[in-house]
């Protein structure tokens, strides 16, 4: 029986390019727009409380039982470190052990090399992650406490992910159509992750309950099993990045029935564009 360790890796090293491009067209206050133009979207003040998404996500993680957080940020980041430093000592989040990992950008690139590379660099900087289990997720999605808890629960499979019911996601249909679909076997093990499948093939992806399941980039992984796959992940020919889903595809091709899919019916608030800011109370 696998008993996952309470480690959470949050990927927040991106440059928030889609958010910044959308600022002109969004109906948000000048204060929020100014913040969004300067800092990572996970640090934008949200709702009446002005509590940013990263604080909300870490609160959910803490309530779910996580005690250590590895926050992957851009190589020259100061904003996340300043946010953490300025949190009052009385804030419950200060009970977390938080470590910063920095994703360096290669000299010949303007942007980081992708999510698989982010994890690889974090595991180099914190070698304990190469020998332990951890949950990894995006820094711009507000994952529910139950999803985070599910990935901490004892299980038989070494790795796991949350398989979201596509019908539960309250996004525009065109946006949902862009999400990767999961292929699962009858026992609920991951067989594949397919990006932007053709409309006429959708019926082939329904699970035993007749549901279409999508990945929202939240996984529970064994570091010793996945480290080499992150290191050796090929660069996607279109996006020109090393992507976590591709590393996972390569892994399950060689090690089938090692990633358990846990179904979930829930909406997942996120901050892809400036229009999403108003969805947070």
Predicted regions and their residues:
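Conserved core of the sugar-phosphate nucleotidyltransferase
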Residues: 144-228
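Short, flexible loop segments at boundaries between secondary-structure elements
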Residues: 45-46, 167-172, 247, 254
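A structural signal for short hydrophobic beta-strand segments in well-ordered beta-sheet cores
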Residues: 43, 181-184, 261
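Conserved beta-loop-beta/alpha segment of the NTase-like Rossmann-fold superfamily
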Residues: 95-181
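Conserved N-terminal catalytic core of the sugar/cofactor nucleotidyltransferase
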Residues: 1-10, 16-34, 47-133
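Conserved alpha/beta core of the MobA/IspD/sugar-nucleotide pyrophosphorylase nucleotidyltransferase superfamily
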Residues: 2-4, 193-281
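Aromatic- and Gly/Pro-rich amphipathic surface segment
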Residues: 33-41
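Cofactor-binding loop segments of dinucleotide-utilizing enzymes, especially the Rossmann-like FAD-
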Residues: 11-14, 74, 139, 164, ...
């Amino acid at each position: 029986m696998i008993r996952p360790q309470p480690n959470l890796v949050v990927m927040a090293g991106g440059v928030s390019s889609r958010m910044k491009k959308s600022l002109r067209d969004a109906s948000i206050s000048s204060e929020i727009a100014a913040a969004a133009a300067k800092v990572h979207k996970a640090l934008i003040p949200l709702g009446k409380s002005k509590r940013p998404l990263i604080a909300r996500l870490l609160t959910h993680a803490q309530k779910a039982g996580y005690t250590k957080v590895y926050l992957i940020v851009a190589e020259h980041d100061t904003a996340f470190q300043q946010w953490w430093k300025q949190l009052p000592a009385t804030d419950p989040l200060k009970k977390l052990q938080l470590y910063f990992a920095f994703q360096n950008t290669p000299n010949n690139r303007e942007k980081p090399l992708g999510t698989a590379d982010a994890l690889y660099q974090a595991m180099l900087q914190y070698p304990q992650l190469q020998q332990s289990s951890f949950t990894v997720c995006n820094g711009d999605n507000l994952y529910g406490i139950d999803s985070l808890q599910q990935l901490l629960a004892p299980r038989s499979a070494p790795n796991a992910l949350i398989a979201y019911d596509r019908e539960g996601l309250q996004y525009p249909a065109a946006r949902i159509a862009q999400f990767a679909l999961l292929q699962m076997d009858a026992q609920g093990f991951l067989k594949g992750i397919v990006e932007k499948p053709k409309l006429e093939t959708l019926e082939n992806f329904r699970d035993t309950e007749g549901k279409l399941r999508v990945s929202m980039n939240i996984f529970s992984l064994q570091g010793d099993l996945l480290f080499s796959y992150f290191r050796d992940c090929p660069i996607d020919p279109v996006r020109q990045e090393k992507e976590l889903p591709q590393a996972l595809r390569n892994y399950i091709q060689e090690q089938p029935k090692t990633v358990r899919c846990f179904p979930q019916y829930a909406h997942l608030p996120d901050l892809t564009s400036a229009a999403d800011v108003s969805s947070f109370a």
